[in-house]
């Protein structure tokens, strides 16, 4: 219940109860100690009071005795000397008592000042000895002055004074003893408090020293950790700088190795070319004929190879097709994944929409239940008000009937049968008429209150009777009064029965109202339980939706990570393939260039041979040889063969140039295709980034929607917010009739802010119906 911000029980928790029990135990112990101190002080004060009362009693008795003794001795004395002696004796007694009191006060003061140095309680009695001596001296002087006539009285007086002195000394001793005991207890408490203060100060000093030591240790540890962190930071910085230097050196070494490798490759190519030239020059003259035949065969083979190369070049490259297929497959894969993600987001949106609809339906159901509860409470309040009005009317009716019963009882008691006989014998007609007038007025008042028509006009007829028929009138009035008394008794019985019926109906109505109130309370408790169960189910659904949203977030992050990894892998594959294709193109170019250089050299050699063989053929016609000469035929055959070779080898340059141009075109097309693929990869990356951004926006929108649902569930939706505003306007109205039950029912669901409560509490009519427990 505490999780929902509600406490239907209204009681504190177990921890608070235990804390209150502990504090009350401590307070009880303190109160017990204080009570013991108070009892001890009260006992000492009682002892002092008893001692002081005894001393006061003794002093008062001594004074009365002195006065009585003086009154007894004055008639029997004839000499003024004896009067003077007695006066001196009395003055000596009074001075003795005064000195004794002064000595007692001085003793108490000295005891209060030096109670620690002198604790003996028996130090007070010495002053009474001197006083007793003075009393004895005064007694001797009085006895010597008075003679045997006052000897017995003086002895009695001396004995009485001694007893008074003993009581005074004992009371003084008790007072001084109590004072000394109080002083000793005070000093002991003071010493104990000083000792406690010293112990507390020592403990505080020890605790302060310990805390200072711990603080110093912690400061040293902090300094050590700071120094260690600084050294570690310096070490890390040094390691980073060393690693950077090592990387630079390794990069330099790698660059040097690359340059050396390139130089070695160039040298190797040069040496190869030199060796090929030397071997070709050495073997040129030896295998000319064999080379011509081989060259012809090689030319044919080269023609066939060139034709095959042309056919292959005309056909599309399978690697390029594989790359295009791979790119298309990746595109389709990414599009399928994007569509799948879009479907998932659409499903999530549908689920959230359905959930929001379900929540709205629940909120509407809760609003309907709240409206039903408010209507039910309104009907109960109206019925209660009607019942209260009926009860008030019945109470007024009962009070009216009580008043009527009282008046009738007074009237009946005023007319008893014994009194009627006495009045008939003692009263006359005028007195009876006056009483009849009074009874008539009482009957009229009772008739007006009870709404019962009584025949009061007969009394008026009695007044108009003649004086000659007075006796008959008196008899008629007596009979009429008896009948009226019977009617009044019957009316009183009817009123009593009616009052009993009214009380029974009131009790039954109160019972029915109590049952209806209990039923309403049970229904309210059931509604509270339903509200709590609905709140719990809403929280469970909220937790489930939050968990589903977290799962969707994790799935989205995982898919994004997979897409990034797959994109990086595809980029690496494309780079590797492009590098391999470039290497193969370079190798093929090198091979084609080497073959073309060899063929150029062979063609140059053939041309030189053809030119050398063509010179003697031109000279033979000058020598007069016929056409049938075999030398001429051989030379012409060789020339035609050379020309045929030259004619056959001349298109190779054009083929080479065409092949180079075709290769350049293919290279440019491959570069364009590579550039296009890179552009497509960049577009895919941009699209993935856009999709990721869109997914993030959708996730943010879904999160905001979930938070909105959570806020709506926490306040039971915007409709309940609207309901709260309406109730707030209703509460600010000046009319306060029937708001208590509705407010207690709604405050279990809605929570007002402190500002709203202050605004409501500022109103003058809100203090009567605002509940004290909800302020």
From Swiss-Prot:
Annotated region (Disordered), positions in chain: 84-153, 614-639
Coiled coil location: 13-61, 153-763
GO molecular function: small GTPase binding
One Pfam family hit: GRIP
Keyword Cytoplasm included in the entry's annotation: yes
GO-annotated cellular components: cytosol; Golgi apparatus; Golgi membrane; Golgi trans cisterna
This protein's UniProt keywords: Coiled coil, Cytoplasm, Golgi apparatus, Membrane
InterPro entries membership: Golgi-autophagy_related (IPR051952), GRIP_dom (IPR000237)
Parts of the chain that traverse the membrane: none
Domain GRIP, chain residue ranges per copy: 713-763
Compositional bias annotation for Basic and acidic residues: 84-93
Record's subcellular location: Cytoplasm; Golgi apparatus membrane
Membrane topology summary: Peripheral membrane protein
Biased segments, Low complexity type: 94-110, 133-147, 629-638
Superkingdom field: Eukaryota
PANTHER family attached to this UniProt entry: GRIP AND COILED-COIL DOMAIN-CONTAINING PROTEIN 1
Function noted in UniProt: Probably involved in maintaining Golgi structure.
UniProt domain comment: Extended rod-like protein with coiled-coil domains.
Protein's name according to its UniProt entry: GRIP and coiled-coil domain-containing protein 1
Higher taxonomy: Eukaryota, Metazoa, Chordata, Craniata, Vertebrata
